[in-house]
């Protein structure tokens, strides 16, 4: 299991979700994608994305610096 990182800071939704989707082919089953984003609607977008693709959203929360961090398992 590997952890890949994606910094989507500065992008407005749905751009962070599009960046997440573009990484799908790079990840293997069990890998985790850690995403940092500062879009105010990121949490709702990423929850819907994970639900649609049936990917576990392991964690989502405030990073302490005004940004959100989430972990998506593939």
Where are these regions (language model features)?
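An N-terminal amphipathic alpha-helical segment
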Residues: 1-29
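Solvent-exposed beta-strand sheet faces enriched in polar/charged residues
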Residues: 7, 36, 60-61
